[in-house]
Amino acid sequence: MQLEIINPESTLVNDVVAHRVAFSIGSNFNIYWYGIIFVCGFLIAILTYSLRLKFHYKVPYDPGFYYIFLAIPMTIIGARLWSLAIGDAKDFFDFRSGGLAIQGGVIAGVLSAAVYFPLILRMPKYHIRDIDADGNVVIRQPSMWIYADAIIPTILIGQALGRWGNFINGEIFGAESTVNDLQWLKKAMPAVFEGMKHYFIEGNKTLFTIYQPLFLYESFFNVIVFVFIYFGLSYIKQLKIGFISMSYFFFYGVTRFSTESARAPQFSFEGTYIINSLLLIFGVLGALYVQFIAPLLRKKFLLDAIIEMFYKKKDQIHKFGELRKPEEFLFYCHK
């Protein structure tokens, strides 16, 4: 939902908030600030997780790069469908009128990744050499969870930047407040302070209601959470792969619960608490699975027997022949 009345007297807010159009190509094609911020969020996230894959996890980053060409359309489609479902958009193809819900984008992006990465990581050129506990050189297929840990938390970068696009569009407002309570905002960010005012006409007077800058709180919290789970959790050696990516869903649910309860009633959507609850539960169950259950399953003889029945390791090793050096053992496993 957007505010339609912008301060008619403040040139500051008109320059920053009311001008949703960054520039125009020709006379009819406008490029909006929201779109520019959206693209910048994507690019920064891509750069971040590519560096993470290359220098931290030391696995090929090409699969993550190629995933972009699947993730972008799937994310946009998912976000658009979700906006239609919650009533924030009326026409699927009218992208220029807004309506991209992050929940739908996240779900669509994760589902497409769950199909894409297991397939592409089977390709021998993406397998890596490593040293096992006995000092033997082995060839390993990187786990899909490594890419999940590198990529999924960077969604927070896009969310943090995207909230500023919401600000320019006149979206994401908190509860009603007072000028006195927001003096800190007036001093620190005058344009944001003015942008939180909703002007209306009552009789012969021009009045305004001022709202809490909820977009700013959520943007700041997203940055804090990103730094914590992306860098802080990496120093806890006891955590299994996949825990970091599952932490995103947990903290996302917590963040949305906190911010949705602080929204002004006219800017809330029905059903938001349900999907936030599901994402939070998914994060908790997923973290428990990758930390405790998955390691146990990998040690079970029965599971190994089932894998052997449906997946012929000898055939796979035969395909790896060109990768092996004379002194190397060839072994298929997950890192």
Curated annotation (Swiss-Prot):
GO terms for molecular function: phosphatidylglycerol-prolipoprotein diacylglyceryl transferase activity. PROSITE patterns: LGT. One of its GO terms (cellular component) is plasma membrane. This is Phosphatidylglycerol--prolipoprotein diacylglyceryl transferase. Its EC number is 2.5.1.145. A 1,2-diacyl-sn-glycero-3-phospho-(1'-sn-glycerol) binds at residue 163. It is a multi-pass membrane protein. Belongs to the Lgt family.
